Amino acid sequence: MLDVNAFDKIRIGLATADDIRGWSHGEVKKPETINYRTLKPEKDGLFGEQIFGPTRDWECACGKYKRVRFKGIVCERCGVEVTRSRVRRERMGHIELAAPVTHIWFFKGVPSRLGYLLNVTPKDLERVIYFASYMVTEVNEDERHNDLPGLQDEFDSEIKRLEQRRDSDIEARAKKVEEDLAALEEAGEAKGPARTKLRNGAERDMAAIRTRYNDQIARVDAVFDKFKKLKPGDMVDDVDLWREMQDRYGDYFDGCMGAEAIKKRLQSLDLETISKELREEIKDASEQRKTKALKRLKVVNAFLTTGNKPEAMVLDVIPVIPPDLRPMVQLDGGRFATSDLNDLYRRVINRNNRLKRLIELGAPEIMLNNEKRMLQEAVDSLFDNGRRGRPVTGASNRPLKSLSDMLKGKQGRFRQNLLGKRVDYSGRSVIVVGPSLRMHQCGLPKPMALELFKPFVIKRLVDLNYAQNMKSAKRLVDRGDAEVWGVLEEVISEHPVLLNRAPTLHRLGIQAFEPILVEGKAIHLPPLACAAFNADFDGDQMAVHLPLSAEAQAEARSLMMASDNILKPADGHTVTMPSQDMILGLYYLSTVLEGVKGQGRVFSSLEEAEMALDRHEIDMQAKVLIRLPESFVLPKNWEPGEVKVLDPREGEDEVVKEERFHDGTVLFATSYGRILFNETLPTDYPFVNEQVAKGRLSKIVDDIAMRYSTQQVAATLDALKDLGFTRAPWSGVSFAFSDVNEPPERDEKIAEYEAKADKVNANYEMGLLTEEARRQELIDLWTECTAEVSKEVEEKFDPTSNLAIIVQSGARGNMMQINQIAGMRGLVANPKGEIIPRPVKSNYRDGLSVLEYFISQHGARKGLADTALRTAESGYLTRRLVDVSQDVIVREEDCGTKAGLPIRVAERDNDGNLVLVKAADGGPYSRLLAADVIDPADGQTVLYKRDDALSMDVLNDLVAHGVEEVKCRSVLTCESKRGVCAKCYGWSLATNKLVDVGETVGIVAAQSIGEPGTQLTLRSFHSGGVAAASDITQGLPRVTELFEARTPKGEAPITEFAGSIKIVENDRGRQIILTPDADSGAPKEDGVIKPITYQVSKRVPLKVADGDHIKVGTQLVEGSVDPKKILTILGKRAAQVNIVEEVHTVYRSQGVDIHDKHIEVIVHQMTRRVTIIDSGDTDLLPGELVDNARFREINRNIVKNGGRPAVGRPALMGITKASLATDSWLSAASFQETTRVLTEAALSEKVDDLKGLKENVIIGKLIPAGTGLARYRNAVVEPDKAIRDTIYPNFGLGGDGDLGDASFSDADLSDLNFSNLEFGDLKLGDDFNPDDFYSDQGGQPDIEE
């Protein structure tokens, strides 16, 4: 077997006939598959055991040799080798063709490679291949040249002879007519009509003679003419002409029909000469001919550089794939189901055998040609059914699946079996909430856990002597004996499992948890993990996967634990936020009410306050004063205040003051609920003495995530969750429909606006308003009415009611929903997305009328339809993004570049003060500085050095110092040859530390952009015909448009030169006339610079004014600019920044946070190539797309040797095009256009370096990222006690030192190699062997390289 790690490159090329015979184990001669009586494969058939190997392990076909001891013997009776039956998945056969056939990929693909090579149009090529035309394959030029004078004489004499015969025949006929006339005269019958009839007949005969001879002369003339000019590659459609030419001059040339002709032509090609001729043609040809020559040169060059033989595109032998890859299965009714490939192979074999027989019989050429054409068609449909003509169909008119179809599309080999495999040791079940679970735990149903951990349990049962051997241990497990469950508990402890919820839109869709055994059949999920998985408990299912090896377990525990994945990689915010019930509980606790029991009481300690609460002396929401120890961290900017005492006793003050005592303790005013809330936060975190709703809680959690270790954050979140769940029922929040009160003024307001609407309609009836103006006025009216009613609802809404608590805390719902229940629904849109000017005046509390209900349906239905479409569209976008960026991996620490991007950190607010830019967390945050930052106050002090990271604190400090812009390192300016470097990327947003080498930042970027894709709108916004000329594309279509580098709809022009603007309006629209400056470099006509006119619509708002002087690249009107124009006019960097900003704008407008660096990674991939304009002294071809790094390297070497470097211009490619243009043919073929990619790769004999992720997944190697990198793969890690104590489950609990064994010491840790959890070298799967368990295998050996 092939060792999967024994190679680091894969090459694809053209197989010659000898290669195919070399792979084969025998020729398939018969179309038969299996014998229907014996059900055994037929000899020499498509399933023949002699060729492909035995159907049963270690047994020949006739049964003479059975058992493994005869291994390798070939049976002399039946000719079958005694070996394993699985060789039937590997061994190939072949079919020797009676006539050559062309490979349809090379002839029918677009462009036709065969056509380019032979310089023949695809149409002509098809006529030759399918026996409609003859092709000249070779001409003996020298002999023809030498013999031409003699042949000319022969030709002349033949023409002369024919002319003489023509003249003599005509003369004879004339003489005959004279004789006939004379005879008539003698007979006395020479009347007018008789003479005329005789003459006419004679003239007809003479004309026929003349025509016959002239045709012969013309044919001879045509044959000789054709022969004189004959050259290889010429085609002749006229069969008679060809035969005549063959008869006369057959010694001087050769030619034929079909693939045979193509093969002979390919064998006689002189590629070196063709290459030289084409290079000459490129230098001084017209643009059209130059383009064609370039395309031809590309194909010719491919053959020259690789040493591939062109004639390999024509096949003499066809490989037959192994029978177990095209199986035949018996169904219940005795019938057979077979793979389509078998039918296609049978057609080929039948036609091939018939052709052989016809050749042996010496059949006429026309029959042979017909049979050869049918053979060609059979091979075509085997390779790519339906590519030419009508596809071959099977039963029920379904086109048969050919070899190409096996590779193509979602169900093809690449995407179905190589990139998406089924996984062993996995299960799936419905999820339910596990409120008592810690963040790192999940509940695993006992039956599922037992099945997943079965081998581990069996081994442990044998180790503990509960069973003598594996068989009895397995019986114990199947019976479910009591001891099994104890062993299962032991086996699963500290063995993490992976949970996954589909669709896995980002990397948080798979996380590791420690399993806890639970009853029932549902998986229990901790509520804090829901947001990351986007899971809820309405019937969602999740899959469980079991990491088996020690390395896999270590990776799951150290990198994938849910308690470590608290931050979202897209924006760096916390993803594990308490929600719903938890928020309600925390909001209730942190609320302080005026005038409740115990307000103003003073307590000497927390314990005293707790006692008072237990005795119902104080309310949890009462403001009390508690003396707190000096370790207590006060809120920022705290000043002592005072609290009014609710029921002061005699002699007590009515007001109590907060104060700080000399011993450092503080008398602090707060509620007991807030004390409880703050106890969940880290001890040194400033006291939060305010009401905590969802937004505030989010800020607190984000802040804690920034300041503390992951373990502390996880502990805090768990404590918040427990407190929220425990206290939510205490709040007693419940609500009924009656809690929603309609404002009494509602009906009056609606009536008032109805009157106004009637007035608008009356004006329309009188012709004072147009239809459009009426519509717009009504829409404005009812929008205003809805807002007024909503305002009334909010004003009359009781802020202490249960419903208000639910909404204000952010637990569920919002004011908009309350308005629809108590106020009015307002205006709704129709399916086109246009607003219907008739509003829904009712609310849900009163119920809708029939018409209102009907027009409301549009929105609901459109919402569902849109969601379905968006999901598909967003998924496809994510797939393309992943594909284009999958090989962007952090390859090195520092590329050493001095370049960077200027990024704004501050802006002016309305008062003119410098404040941090709005999207700071999505722009400058987490980047490294590309240059020192100097204090603008003195121009000398270095505030921060190059390579310092921009945290939020640093950014705020920069703003405080008056710094407005800094130069940051960026992926766009990174100079790593492959991938990016850590310093140009900056911090990983998932950890807030510098990104590790090996991090797959490309995939993370694609997931970050794709995951919120479903939240983006799908429609183009219609602005009511006022603001913009056309619908401005927004949402998901706009993102797609940008990433595919398409020219936007309603494109806004930008100026190519600096100059002055003049705006002219006329009937046809508006013209903006630019008069370029004299020094702008604009082209001149007769020494004068010609003005440039831009035609724009009158309805589009202008961005320039008449008489303005503008810079190069100024946008003239509102709208989207074509990034390709920006690239041409302003250069690569401006185009890159434009795409990043535009994509960011779309996401921000939908309220989605995403960091610019993710978009930059994608844009970096879109602009990483150069189009060659002039090849200089390099081997590059004009028009070729070359990687930036390779382009620079080639030029560097050329210049070093004194040559002329190539000239190129930056290219901007859409993500689909960029994915297909990748260096890895495996990656491109598994993306789209599989057959085209493979055709091109085979011709160029491309080598895949296996540097990306997809390529390695396809061939089953570890991916070259993360722990798959050699630097990590070879590391041996053993945790010590200190490390184990800091892991979150044991965090702050004294670790796991107390194992109940008094003699336990740290030294014993070295013996804990968990060998009982491992299988050593045993790999579970098909070859699971019980014998391997009898001796203890010990731990896995370390991987060595």
From Swiss-Prot:
Binding site for Mg(2+): D536, D538, D540
GO CC list: DNA-directed RNA polymerase complex
Reactions performed catalytically: RNA(n) + a ribonucleoside 5'-triphosphate = RNA(n+1) + diphosphate
Keyword Plastid among record annotations: no
Cofactor: binding comment: Binds 1 Mg(2+) ion per subunit.
GO molecular function: DNA binding; DNA-directed RNA polymerase activity; magnesium ion binding; zinc ion binding
Residues spanning the membrane: none
Enzyme class: transferase
Entry-linked Pfam families: RNA_pol_Rpb1_1 (PF04997), RNA_pol_Rpb1_2 (PF00623), RNA_pol_Rpb1_3 (PF04983), RNA_pol_Rpb1_4 (PF05000), RNA_pol_Rpb1_5 (PF04998)
Cited InterPro entries: DNA-dir_RpoC_beta_prime, DNA-dir_RpoC_beta_prime_bact, RNA_pol_asu, RNA_pol_N, RNA_pol_Rpb1_1, RNA_pol_Rpb1_3, RNA_pol_Rpb1_3_sf, RNA_pol_Rpb1_4
CDD domains registered for this protein in UniProt: RNAP_beta'_C, RNAP_beta'_N
EC number: 2.7.7.6
Biological role: DNA-dependent RNA polymerase catalyzes the transcription of DNA into RNA using the four ribonucleoside triphosphates as substrates.
Assembly behavior: The RNAP catalytic core consists of 2 alpha, 1 beta, 1 beta' and 1 omega subunit. When a sigma factor is associated with the core the holoenzyme is formed, which can initiate transcription.
Database matches in PANTHER family: DNA-DIRECTED RNA POLYMERASE, DNA-DIRECTED RNA POLYMERASE SUBUNIT BETA
Identification of the protein by name: DNA-directed RNA polymerase subunit beta'
Species annotation: Bifidobacterium longum (strain NCC 2705)
Organism taxonomic ancestry: Bacteria, Bacillati, Actinomycetota, Actinomycetes, Bifidobacteriales
Record gene name: rpoC
